[in-house]
């Protein structure tokens, strides 16, 4: 019984490094299971008095070892989740970076097109502008044939006023009106 207590104290004093090796946890769990099975199958008369107490200790040891293993798996799962989130974030950043690069290339391409169009159409525009201004100066004494013809706007309030006046309706009788 003293060796069991010493083993329990040693296992509690030497915490298992969960970061390094899960095999240690599996080995410890396996040893404790073997110890429990050996104890249960052993038929020693001297130990029959303490059977309940020893079984409780063995089961407690087994539960502690399984809890340590469970904690290890939980820590691994949280690490995996954190790594997964980092990878997803990196993928999203990469995707946005590619979109920006594509848009920058598109902007550069259209910027070059605008320059090309400007070099092509600017001389035409300047020559047409020069012709237009020289023609307008030559025709300053004559009525400008390029000026727009003035079209009077209808008097909108008087039209609305005429439409809103009451008029007799032949179908409704002499005194009726339609607005």
Curated annotation (Swiss-Prot):
GO molecular function: transcription coregulator activity
Keyword Calcium: no
Main localization of the protein described in the UniProt heading: nucleus
Highest taxon in the source lineage: Eukaryota
Alphabetical UniProt keywords: Activator, Coiled coil, Nucleus, Transcription, Transcription regulation
InterPro entries: Mediator_Med28
Subcellular location: Nucleus
Positions in coiled-coil regions: 81-119
GO biological processes: transcription by RNA polymerase II
Gene Ontology cellular-component terms listed: mediator complex
Pfam family, one: Med28
Function: Component of the Mediator complex, a coactivator involved in the regulated transcription of nearly all RNA polymerase II-dependent genes. Mediator functions as a bridge to convey information from gene-specific regulatory proteins to the basal RNA polymerase II transcription machinery. Mediator is recruited to promoters by direct interactions with regulatory proteins and serves as a scaffold for the assembly of a functional preinitiation complex with RNA polymerase II and the general transcription factors.
Family as reported in the entry's similarity comment: Belongs to the Mediator complex subunit 28 family.
Quaternary organization: Component of the Mediator complex.
Protein's recorded name: Putative mediator of RNA polymerase II transcription subunit 28
Organism encoding this protein: Dictyostelium discoideum (Social amoeba)
Highest classification ranks of the organism: Eukaryota, Amoebozoa, Evosea, Eumycetozoa, Dictyostelia
Gene: med28
């Amino acid at each position: 019984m003293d060796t069991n207590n010493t083993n329990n104290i040693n296992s509690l004093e030497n915490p298992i490094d969960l970061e390094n090796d899960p095999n240690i946890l599996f080995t410890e769990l396996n040893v404790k299971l073997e110890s429990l099975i050996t104890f249960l199958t052993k038929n020693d008369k001297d130990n029959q008095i303490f059977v309940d107490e020893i079984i409780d200790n063995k089961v407690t040891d087994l539960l502690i070892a399984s809890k340590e293993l469970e904690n290890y798996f939980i820590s691994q799962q949280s690490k995996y989740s954190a790594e997964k989130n980092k990878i997803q974030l990196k993928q999203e950043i990469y995707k946005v970076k590619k979109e920006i690069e594509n848009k920058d290339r598109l902007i550069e391409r259209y910027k070059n097109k605008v320059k090309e169009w400007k070099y092509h159409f600017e001389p035409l525009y300047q020559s047409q502008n020069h012709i237009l201004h020289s023609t307008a100066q030559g025709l300053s004494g004559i009525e400008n044939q390029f000026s727009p013809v003035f079209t009077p706007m209808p008097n909108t309030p008087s039209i609305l006023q005429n439409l809103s006046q009451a008029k007799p309706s032949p179908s409704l009788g002499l005194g009726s009106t339609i607005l």
